[in-house]
């Protein structure tokens, strides 16, 4: 009986601890499930004036939980690296919009927020010393990132190695939207166009090289078949090294 009683008590307090999160999810089905959607009313109007601080805590926990789920989901939808050696990374670098996006993709912002949460758990001294700007850190290769349209890309290579035409517009229920791709490549005007930064040129030959990854986009193949396919776009700038012979 004692063990049964203790089990019931633990289960009871476990349910009480989980209740604020569930209530926050129920109240936030119209707005808390995804960032940027506004709900009506205030915490005080729902639970009373004394529940404001407790509600804010549960809201913050819910928001962090949503971010973690989105980041985990991005990991799940990446292609199998064993079957596709060239697909070293899959990210949401494609956006459908009527105009050029003003910010990087959402997952980039979520990863930055996640890094901010990790940094918030550090002490002030650790954060100060971990800041790359304070340590004078520089990238090995200079890169640039920008949104491009299908009009700029024209064609791309799919996962089977075939060349497909990238469609500029995607039909939707209320018209058409343009496909935008967030590409990252080596900066031809940067200081690393002659070689990687910080490499000993006496022993190594270095070169900054743009690498590609797969993203999903609306395309048309050589047989005029339209569909969503994984295509390669520029996603990073890496340093390649070769040892100098005769040394």
From Swiss-Prot:
Disulfide bonds join 141-208, 186-237, 196-239. Residues 19-128 form a propeptide. It holds the Pfam family NGF. Mature BDNF is produced by proteolytic removal of the propeptide, catalyzed by a FURIN family member. In addition, the precursor form is proteolytically cleaved within the propeptide, but this is not an obligatory intermediate for the production of mature BDNF. Can be converted into mature BDNF by plasmin (PLG). SUPFAM superfamilies: Cystine-knot cytokines. GO terms for molecular function: growth factor activity; nerve growth factor receptor binding. Important signaling molecule that activates signaling cascades downstream of NTRK2. During development, promotes the survival and differentiation of selected neuronal populations of the peripheral and central nervous systems. Participates in axonal growth, pathfinding and in the modulation of dendritic growth and morphology. Major regulator of synaptic transmission and plasticity at adult synapses in many regions of the CNS. Monomers and homodimers. Binds to NTRK2/TRKB. Can form heterodimers with other neurotrophin family members, such as NTF3 and NTF4 (in vitro), but the physiological relevance of this is not clear. BDNF precursor form: interacts with the heterodimer formed by NGFR and SORCS2. This is Neurotrophic factor BDNF precursor form. It comes from Homo sapiens (Human).
């Amino acid at each position: 009986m004692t063990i049964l009683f203790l089990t019931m008590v633990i289960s009871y307090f476990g349910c009480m601890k989980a209740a604020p999160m569930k209530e926050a999810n129920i109240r936030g089905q119209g707005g808390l499930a995804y960032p940027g959607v506004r709900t009506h009313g205030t915490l005080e109007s729902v639970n009373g004036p004394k529940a404001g601080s407790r509600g804010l805590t549960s809201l913050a926990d819910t928001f962090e939980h949503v971010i973690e789920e989105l980041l985990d989901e991005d990991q799940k939808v990446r292609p199998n690296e064993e079957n596709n050696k060239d697909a070293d990374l899959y990210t949401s670098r494609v956006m459908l919009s009527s105009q050029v996006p003003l910010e990087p993709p959402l997952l980039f912002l979520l990863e930055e927020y996640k890094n901010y949460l990790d940094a918030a758990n550090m002490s002030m001294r650790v954060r100060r010393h971990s800041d790359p700007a304070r340590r004078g850190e520089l990238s090995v290769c200079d890169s640039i990132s920008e949104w491009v349209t299908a009009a700029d890309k024209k064609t791309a290579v799919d996962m089977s190695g075939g060349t497909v035409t990238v469609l500029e517009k995607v039909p939707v229920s209320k018209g058409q939207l343009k496909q935008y791709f967030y590409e990252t490549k080596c900066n031809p005007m940067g200081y690393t166009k002659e070689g990687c930064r910080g490499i000993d040129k006496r022993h190594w030959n270095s070169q900054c090289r743009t690498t590609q990854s797969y993203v999903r986009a609306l395309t048309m193949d050589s047989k005029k078949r339209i569909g969503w396919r994984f295509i390669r776009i520029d996603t990073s700038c890496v340093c390649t090294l070769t040892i100098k012979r005769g040394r």
